[in-house]
């Protein structure tokens, strides 16, 4: 198992990017969360099998027709074994 913390820069707010992230995470059976930050970035944590996490990161970095990723900051985090879902967070709270 692997868990990553990611901050994504680019055109990633107001373009459905969080929903795209959640969809891609659920496709790969990942858990974690995603949220918008006040500075225009999107922040997330994702956890799952190492190969699934890497494929997820590659897909997120490619963006969508509307979302353009210019930079991703990725850090390893401790696995949370009790986490069961991947959720979109609103209002900036964890």
Curated annotation (Swiss-Prot):
GN (gene name):
acyP
Q: Does the keyword Cell membrane apply?
A: no
InterPro entries assigned: Acylphosphatase (IPR020456), Acylphosphatase-like_dom (IPR001792), Acylphosphatase-like_dom_sf (IPR036046), Acylphosphatase_CS (IPR017968)
The top EC class is hydrolase
Q: Which superkingdom heads the taxonomic lineage of this protein's source? A: Bacteria
Q: Where is the active site?
A: 18, 36
**Pfam families recorded:** Acylphosphatase
Q: What is this protein called?
A: Acylphosphatase
Keywords for the protein's UniProt record, in alphabetical order: Hydrolase
Which reaction equation describes what this protein catalyses?
Answer: an acyl phosphate + H2O = a carboxylate + phosphate + H(+)
The catalytic activity of this protein is classed by the Enzyme Commission as: 3.6.1.7
Query: Where does this protein have coiled-coil stretches?
Result: none
User: GO MF annotations for this entry?
Assistant: acylphosphatase activity
Q: Which Gene3D superfamilies match?
A: 3.30.70.100
Residue ranges occupied by any Acylphosphatase-like domain in the UniProt entry: 3-90
Segments crossing the lipid bilayer: none
- Indicate the family of this protein: Belongs to the acylphosphatase family.
């Amino acid at each position: 198992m692997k868990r990553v913390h990611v901050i994504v820069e680019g055109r990633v707010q107001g373009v459905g990017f969080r929903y795209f992230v959640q969809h891609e995470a659920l496709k790969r059976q990942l858990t974690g969360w995603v949220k918008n930050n006040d500075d225009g970035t999107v922040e997330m944590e994702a956890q799952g099998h190492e190969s699934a996490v890497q494929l997820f990161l590659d897909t997120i970095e490619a963006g969508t027709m509307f979302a353009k990723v210019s930079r991703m900051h990725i850090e390893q985090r401790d696995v949370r074994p009790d986490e069961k879902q991947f959720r979109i967070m609103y209002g900036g709270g964890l």
